[in-house]
């Protein structure tokens, strides 16, 4: 890419929509490769301000190709992408580097909880070495479409801080309101929730988060799609760079605190209220045994 464009990109971490034209190439050990024009922008939240930055590659018609058509990940059965992410390791890049891919890799394919595929790569930008990165899927409506083989047009993706990543927050707010205003100890209320939430998926997600003692909880994401699983809510595991730091932390108390998680008070409404139900508690304990 133009060196001045890259310099401007690096110097403006607070410019969330700042995107520049680039050309991406991947060369694999088996000799296969792709080369494609794309857009590049900084990726992440606070990690945008770190020395080793993460990047999103955007495949758009304005750059010459509307999609990347290439089998990037051997454990995925699709080969069309609107975007990919080059993750630096974020807060873990000066430590283990592998926390995020380790945790999501342990869960991948073992439960219905979605995680990003990854491929370790060595990154060069304009011929300069930038270190070891993880090439990953980008979590958006196209990711849900690829993973669940459904149209992306009716996808809602909501972060635990209420940021809408795709679609609308309306049905998510309705879910939280129902949980807060109806006693989940009553079986008829829990039976209704089972029609709009995949409770095993939610249990598996929070069990994994508890095992990993992931304190950077803001990137918790829930999703639903009208064409998948009767539009029930599911979870996505993402951003585990802070996993396995504070292993003595009482994470169960943390994730069920009525005041919310961290100083920001991120909602514990879903898990906390589900645990009021005897059937869900039995499922939760059963899934702990399965996952361990």
Protein language model regions, located:
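Regulatory N- and C-terminal appendages and interdomain linkers associated
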Residues: 1-46
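Loop/turn elements at helix/coil->beta-strand transitions in domains of secreted/extracellular proteins
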Residues: 81-82, 112-116, 128, 185, ...
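C-terminal catalytic region of ATP-dependent kinase domains
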Residues: 229-292
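Short, well-structured beta-strand/strand-turn elements
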Residues: 109-123
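Active-site acidic catalytic loop and adjacent metal/ATP-binding pocket
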Residues: 57, 197-252
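Solvent-exposed, polar/charged alpha-helical surfaces in well-ordered, non-transmembrane soluble domains
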Residues: 101-105, 173, 177, 282, ...
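ATP-dependent phospho-/nucleotidyl transfer catalytic cores
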Residues: 70-91, 95, 128-130, 134-214, ...
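A conserved alpha-helical element in kinase catalytic cores
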Residues: 92-112
């Amino acid at each position: 890419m133009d060196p001045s464009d890259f310099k401007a990109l690096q110097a403006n971490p607070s410019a969330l929509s700042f995107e520049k034209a680039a050309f991406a190439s991947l060369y694999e050990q088996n000799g296969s490769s792709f080369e494609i024009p794309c857009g590049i922008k900084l990726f992440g939240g606070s990690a945008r301000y770190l020395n080793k930055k993460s990047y999103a590659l955007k495949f758009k018609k304005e750059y010459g190709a509307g999609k990347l058509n290439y089998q990037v990940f051997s454990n995925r059965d699709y080969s069309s992408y609107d975007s990919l992410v080059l993750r630096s390791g974020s807060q873990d890049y000066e430590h283990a580097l592998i926390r995020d891919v380790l945790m999501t890799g342990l869960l991948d394919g073992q439960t219905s909880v979605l995680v990003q595929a990854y491929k370790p790569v060595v990154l060069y930008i304009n011929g300069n070495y930038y270190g070891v990165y993880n090439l990953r899927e980008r979590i958006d409506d196209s990711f849900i479409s690829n993973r669940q083989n459904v149209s992306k047009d009716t996808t809602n993706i909501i972060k635990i801080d209420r940021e809408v990543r795709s679609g609308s927050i309306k049905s998510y707010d309705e879910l939280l309101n129902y949980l807060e205003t109806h006693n989940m100890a009553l079986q008829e209320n829990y039976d209704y929730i089972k029609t709009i939430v995949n409770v095993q998926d939610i249990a598996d997600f929070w069990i994994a988060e508890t095992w990993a003692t992931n304190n950077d909880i803001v990137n918790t994401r829930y999703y639903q799609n009208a064409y998948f699983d009767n539009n029930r809510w599911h979870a996505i595991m993402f951003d585990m760079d802070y996993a396995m730091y504070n292993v003595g932390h009482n994470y169960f108390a943390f994730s069920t605190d009525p005041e919310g998680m961290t100083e920001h008070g991120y909602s514990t409404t879903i898990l906390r209220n589900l645990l009021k139900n005897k059937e869900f508690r039995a499922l939760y304990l059963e899934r702990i045994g399965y996952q361990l």
